[in-house]
Amino acid sequence: MHPGDGHTAACLIGWPAAHSRSPLIHHYWLRTLGIPGGYSIESVPPEGFAEFVLNLRAHGYSGANVTIPHKERALQLTQPDDRARAVGAANTLYYDGDVLRSTNTDVEGFIANLDASAPGWDRTPHAVVLGAGGSARAVLFGLLERGIERIALANRSLERAQALADLFGERVVPIAWTDAPAALPGAGLLVNTTSLGMKGQPSLDLDLEPLPSDATVADLVYVPLETELLAEARGRGLRTADGLGMLLHQAVRGFELWFGARPHVTAELRALVEADLAAK
């Protein structure tokens, strides 16, 4: 199915964008929900991004996902919601009448994955977040929105952690990376937003022994599916939430905005994406 054939179509805009799993996810939902629609990949260089986005309908699309390196620029070219503004990046574009709006679905993807993987995780008042990059901003916004009272934010650059604390308020407490172990006792949630533990990256060296026995450990990395951090957490009997779950759940909102039906993250969909990851 192609843009302009009379059916609703959305796309992923990136540079490059060829290895995204988004088409696999959205085509699965279109097929299983019986919706005539399409989802394509559009590789658009930075110098052509503004023209493409501002003429999205002329290109045949009613909405889009946006990935690297365009997410900050997308924020400037659209009418962003509070989540996109707080995160500082937009990953989902949609029309509200003739107004092109944007949001960041990483926030609800992260929270929905926690809800599905570890129901009741939000009963804890304290959390520890590792890393202070773009992903951390989405995580912090979601945790604060959900009512977490205190978040220790550990980063190798304390200045970057302090900058996010200044942005999000006094409930976010910046700490040195080496102080992360001391923050674990009493923390009901630990979240890794760094690339440590990803295939080809150094391991995340952190002893989970100080965590409470009912804590939840989340890792945004999904290659490998089970990082060393998650393996250790499971070995200790802790509940876990992996990066693939977040990837799947963050796609839900965009699909709903474009195609008018709210899809579900199913075991079948997860198995489909796992098989695709294993084949690469």
Swiss-Prot record:
The catalysed reaction is: shikimate + NADP(+) = 3-dehydroshikimate + NADPH + H(+)
As for what it does, the entry says: Involved in the biosynthesis of the chorismate, which leads to the biosynthesis of aromatic amino acids. Catalyzes the reversible NADPH linked reduction of 3-dehydroshikimate (DHSA) to yield shikimate (SA).
Listed under GO biological process in this entry are: amino acid biosynthetic process; aromatic amino acid family biosynthetic process; chorismate biosynthetic process; shikimate metabolic process
**Catalytic residues (positions):** K71 (proton acceptor)
UniProt-listed NCBIfam families = aroE (TIGR00507), PRK00258.1-4 (NF001312)
Residues binding NADP(+) are D82, G131, A132, G133, G134, S135, L220, G243
Recorded hits in InterPro entries, A to Z, give: Aminoacid_DH-like_N_sf, NAD(P)-bd_dom_sf, SDH_C, Shikimate_DH, Shikimate_DH-bd_N, Shikimate_DH_fam, Shikm_DH/Glu-tRNA_Rdtase
Q: Where does shikimate bind?
A: S20, R21, S22, T67, N91, D106, Y222
Whom does it interact with, and what assembly results? Homodimer.
Q: What's the family?
A: Belongs to the shikimate dehydrogenase family.
Q: What is this protein called?
A: Shikimate dehydrogenase (NADP(+))
The answer to whether the entry has keyword Oxidoreductase is yes
Looking at the UniProt record for this protein, which Gene Ontology cellular component terms does it annotate, in alphabetical order?
cytosol
A GO MF annotation of the entry reads: NADP binding
Q: Which SUPFAM superfamilies match?
A: Aminoacid dehydrogenase-like, N-terminal domain, NAD(P)-binding Rossmann-fold domains
Stretches assigned to coiled coil: none
Q: Which UniProt keywords apply?
A: Amino-acid biosynthesis, Aromatic amino acid biosynthesis, NADP, Oxidoreductase
Pathway the protein takes part in: Metabolic intermediate biosynthesis; chorismate biosynthesis; chorismate from D-erythrose 4-phosphate and phosphoenolpyruvate: step 4/7
Name the Enzyme Commission number(s) assigned to this protein. 1.1.1.25
